[in-house]
Amino acid sequence: MKDSYNRRIDYLRISITDKCNLKCVYCMPSKGLKYFKEAEILTDEEIVRFIRIARNHGLRKVRITGGEPLMRKNIISLVSSIKETGIRDLSLTTNGITLSKIAGDLKAAGLDRVNISLDTLEAARYKTITKGGDINLVRESIKEAERAGLTPVKINVVPIRGINEDEILAFASLTFKENYHIRFIEFMPATRNGIWRKKRCVNSEEVLEKISTLGKLESFEFRGRGPSRNYRLKGAAGIIGIISPLSDHFCGFCNRLRLTADGKIRPCLFSREEIDIKTPMRNNATDEDIDKLFQHSIKVKPRRHLLNENTASTRIIKTMSKIGG
């Protein structure tokens, strides 16, 4: 289905929990987070019902997010149920802390691949950024994801000035030997009262300039309409992706909606607009009723975000862990 600006919307990102087993400095509020009660979260049946309805309008791609999605107790059966709806491309974003234990089970259930969030290669720094995480668990998860066939493994890196921007070259260098997709994502305002400051953002052109010191960067495009500009260093096995929501927004070909953990469709990540589907579902709404809400959410999708405008309408009103990253 196309929106008001002729963009084909065929991708849904679903947050299945707001809980997380890490407390990353750029994601969690400085004062902590009050989690949703279990009854406030969409059930498996509600999630699958919504996907089946959206499939009628050309939905083909689903990404499961959180919080940390692997904290959901029945994640394996949920993955299986989503895949059974006929979704062609099913992926999941995780911090990798517990992935190694169930990577094979996730693949068998129908998961196609994973993105693993990792902002440093140094154990001590990882513990600081995540407030206690063990990087060795993530390293093992990357290996297990490869063994299970959840490939290509994509590693999401958020360069933050004064925290980890000195590791950009180390991450990029991983692609010489490994078939990883290393994706550098500009630091965005992800929570209220967090560490986000515009001066901390390392813009994508600076990232590319640093990486180019390692060798010639060749443009490498994939089929699809994702936000990543992709490159390969000459002679490298893997890919480098650049995602620039601030310095070079990709709104003109955005193809996605988000479904929050508490059952609200979010047409744009950085908008106050939300369409509640949970309440109607729990009040005997028909599939036709939910279908109309889905179509409405596409029609009200804005032309672009206004992050750089610093207006009241774009100030963060939920943490990224509740919206789904």
Predicted regions and their residues:
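Glycine-centered loop/turn positions within well-structured domains
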Residues: 22, 123-124, 249, 275
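Canonical Radical SAM [4Fe-4S] cluster-binding loop centered on the CxxxCxxC motif
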Residues: 4-44
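Auxiliary Fe-S-binding modules of radical SAM enzymes
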Residues: 1-11, 177, 187-325
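A short acidic, helix-capping loop that chelates divalent metal ions and anchors anionic groups
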Residues: 32-37, 122-129, 191-195, 276-278
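Residues that scaffold the ATP/ADP-binding catalytic core of kinase and kinase-like folds
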Residues: 23, 27, 124, 129, ...
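Short, small-residue-rich loop/turn micro-motifs
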Residues: 18-20, 28-31, 118-120, 186, ...
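Conserved, mostly hydrophobic/aromatic
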Residues: 16, 64, 263
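Radical SAM/AdoMet-radical enzyme domain recognition
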Residues: 41-64, 68-185
